[in-house]
Amino acid sequence: MNSLSHTLPPELDSALQETLQKWQTSDSTARLWQRDASLWTGADEAEWLGWLEIVQQSLDGLNDVQAVIRTMLDDGIRQVVLLGMGGSSMAPEVLRDTFGCQPNAAELFVLDSTDPDQITNIDNALTLEQTVFVVASKSGSTLEPNILMAHFYHRMVEAVSAERAAGHFIAITDPGSSLEQQAAEYGFRHIFAGVPSIGGRFSALSHYGVVPAAMIGMDCRRFLESAQSMVSACKTTAGATENPGVMLGSIIAVAAHQGHDKLTLVLSPGIASLGAWLEQLIAESTGKQGTGVLPLDGEPIGAPDVYG
């Protein structure tokens, strides 16, 4: 399952082999997992690699997450609205669209816009007495989720009273954030901690993705254990060609260096929504210092010769 196959023209394949040899000679896989910032600029990169170990951390904390969700469902909650922007909302939306909301779980809405029509449409679909709002913001200071939280908190006060409104809110935020402080002051149902060393677009397998996934009834343990097997495959130092992460990254990099910097995403219908998350992940991660790879999601597929 954790493998990769590829076919490249001779000039790209030759460059790939050279790149893989350099990677292996410099022991770069081991250095990556040791968070060696010299693989990049030698600046603060080591402080942003928490995603390397997050799968095991999420597995270790899964029972606690599921206990909170069980209590929520036992209290009659059947609708969840996630309020977030960018990486904090993208992964939950992909998981919902891919796996669906399971029976006896909650229905998930994702609101990542302050467009009045979108807010009204979701508002009209809710039974507030049976709804929990999940405010997902790493910094806690992102304007849009805070505006949405204020709006729906007011609506919840109207629906269930000021004393009970906070019990219909959950926060996912990094420790020490303004949202954590506000959620504690209000008495939110629960506060799930983010990991400061994980950027938003890398947070899919942390609480930002796992908590909404548990709410819709996903088999999160199976999901994370599957991810953990890929972690193991990407951690191997046996050889660069045996490491699917190194191989994929090297192919994309070699192609980009030779002018093939448009990456068309071709996805099966069942995982089509994954393209939007990959698009953000790749564009935001590689688009630095005037260079980068341009991912294209949802583009009509053409003949091979149109990709040059």
Model-predicted segments: where are they?
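Short acidic, glycine/serine/threonine-rich loops at helix termini
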Residues: 91-96, 120-123, 144-149, 179-185, ...
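Active-site cofactor/substrate anionic-group-binding motifs, chiefly glycine-
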Residues: 73-81, 86-87, 96-107
